[in-house]
């Protein structure tokens, strides 16, 4: 194997190894955050409380739908990354089977396309998330959900709603605390921004992983043909000369 091919395959192997470890870690953290009762217990008790008045129940339902869609999108993409990374590692250590590398290249292109699509969808639906968050906090104050409000206000160190009559009751005239609808959405938005930066780094690494196999796939082994015809012709000429 040529030295440059060995270097490319080595880099590709470690890129896929990093992608595999990151995907497995993301799956583990996702399930831990989603299903471990010890993680953010108070907030889960707020979102997954089902005996609320209709307006508050509808607002919580919309947030739950968001959480479920985002959660399973992350898990699904992570599982796809695991399969793709394993196939990439196999193709990098098995140079004689280009079929593995072609399959890997197709899968990682599909994976990157899905990741970009999910990122664009989240950006497009960002205003919807903002509206759902505002509706949730507004419904808590409107229905006077005392337990939910206490959890939210203690968690985010906030009070009231932006441009609302409830602010005098809950915040007081001299309060410097941010409004709860703003504080909650800012927290969610910051998390989305951090996730977007991480996704951008992953996409850059995956783009490199897409480019690396291309020189190997388009390269061809050089074949050498040895012709003995001149030697045969020379022997024939010598034979004719000896006849005379």
Swiss-Prot record:
Keywords from the named record: Membrane, Transmembrane, Transmembrane helix
Cytoplasm found in the keyword field: no
Places the protein is found: Membrane
Keyword Cell inner membrane applies: no
TM helices/strands, residue ranges: 11-31, 67-87, 104-124, 198-218
Sequence similarity: Belongs to the tetraspanin (TM4SF) family.
PANTHER family named in the record: TETRASPANIN, TETRASPANIN-1
Listed name of the protein: Tetraspanin-1
Gene source species: Caenorhabditis elegans
High-level lineage: Eukaryota, Metazoa, Ecdysozoa, Nematoda, Chromadorea
Name of the encoding gene: tsp-1
